[in-house]
């Protein structure tokens, strides 16, 4: 059984006991959250597709940790003008462990 959920403007396919990195959520470490933006649920040959979400479906997940991703480098450069600008960015994330998929 798996589900497709929406979190942070992105869609994620999730299974039970799977770890998932999503955009930063306002939840404490160890807290259990309920995600109700379930777009699709598949159980063997049986599937439910929401329009836009599946009614009554939810995914329960536990917050494992909050952290920051790897640094990316943003570089701007203009040739022949001695202009060179570099900037770094690290995106915050929340690591979730999927506990249950409820239909």
Curated annotation (Swiss-Prot):
GO terms for molecular function: rRNA binding; structural constituent of ribosome. The lineage of its organism: Bacteria, Pseudomonadati, Pseudomonadota, Gammaproteobacteria, Moraxellales. This protein binds to 23S rRNA in the presence of protein L20. InterPro entries: bL21-like, bL21-like_sf, Ribosomal_bL21, Ribosomal_bL21_CS. One of its GO terms (biological process) is translation. The keyword Secreted does not apply. It comes from the Bacteria. This is Large ribosomal subunit protein bL21. Belongs to the bacterial ribosomal protein bL21 family. Part of the 50S ribosomal subunit. Contacts protein L20. One of its GO terms (cellular component) is ribonucleoprotein complex. Keywords: Ribonucleoprotein, Ribosomal protein, RNA-binding, rRNA-binding.
